[in-house]
């Protein structure tokens, strides 16, 4: 599923990318036969083949079941910590953002907060402003 458009020389990169997102065992399956969460992991693997320094994801777990959602976030955390890949993603899931974010950017037509995740979650005024906003989570490797 990831190797589309890649040469034979890239097969090792494809295998490595699939292992990083825990999809190696399903490498021979068609993308349409995979669950939504599995498909998201394949899309991440496809990006990993090119050795990115940053992944930018828009609501990556929308419609994904709870098990695959947790697995997806665990994979993103590992990519951040082990592979030194910065991950920026948009989310309205405050629980996930609070558990995983190093930094938070909160937008509601303008940027009204950008800083350390815990500062945001400890600020009652910020939490009130959050309603009807778009939040972006950042996992930076420093």
Q: What are the residue ranges of the model-derived segments?
A:
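Conserved ABC ATPase "signature" region
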Residues: 9-26
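Conserved ABC ATPase signature
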Residues: 30-34, 38
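Catalytic Walker B motif of ABC-type/P-loop ATPase nucleotide-binding domains
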Residues: 55-58
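H-loop/switch region of ABC-family ATPase nucleotide-binding domains
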Residues: 91-92
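A short, surface-exposed alpha-helical micro-motif characterized by mixed small hydrophobic
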Residues: 97-99
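Conserved beta-strand-loop-alpha-helix hinge in the C-terminal portion
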Residues: 110-132
């Amino acid at each position: 599923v990831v190797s589309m458009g890649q040469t034979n020389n890239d097969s090792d990169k494809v295998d490595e990318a699939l292992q990083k997102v825990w999809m190696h065992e399903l490498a021979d399956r068609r993308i349409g036969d995979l669950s939504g969460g599995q498909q998201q992991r394949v899309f991440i693997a496809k990006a990993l083949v090119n050795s990115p320094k940053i992944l930018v994801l828009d609501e990556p777990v929308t419609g994904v079941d709870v098990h695959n959602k947790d697995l997806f976030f665990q994979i993103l955390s590992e990519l951040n910590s082990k592979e030194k890949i910065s991950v920026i993603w948009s989310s309205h899931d405050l629980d996930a953002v609070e558990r995983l974010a190093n930094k938070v950017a909160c937008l509601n037509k303008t940027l009204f907060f950008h800083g350390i995740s815990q500062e945001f979650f400890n600020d009652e005024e910020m939490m009130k402003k959050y309603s009807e906003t778009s939040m972006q989570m950042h996992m930076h490797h420093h």
